[in-house]
């Protein structure tokens, strides 16, 4: 797999002549399983084949159950300078419902260590979860803001057919999704993000003003998005950078 990605990096280089790479994003949920050496091989390939700006933002996507303290320390000693962590919720019942591998304690412990060794952290939070009320959503946001994360990607829960959660809802084990409740969660999110000093980049994507001021100069221009081996496409800041190199 790594050989194939490196090969495509080399083959696609001519498609981006004259462009500069400003952001490198290792996505897909589990790139944290790669060793520092394996990550560095791909980063070195990008530097060799593309024009990379000085001090680019290099993000690694990971789940809390993969980010032990030792692993976070290892990553802080690599070229990675930003973590994107799939927290989803700080409430155990929510995590169990969504069949997440981590629990609330692991989520908070992960962020505690991550904020000690990284100063640029993004987390995912999900709202509109069956049974979630404004109080628990407020508690989720309060916890995130208290950790001082400077980027939050927040999404309304969607339930795909033939999934375990879909079956549980059909059987009445969990209440169905409520669009009105999700709307209330979204409105509360907007209020809280303003109070916390975060700016809305796109609906549901919040960044600290310091990060926002860094990238706002390019908002509005059409940019290239390059996606390699992802199950889904990340659009975060896609209109604010020259090339958004995603691995």
Please identify what each model-predicted range represents.
Residues 1-15, 19-247:
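C-terminal scaffold of the Radical SAM
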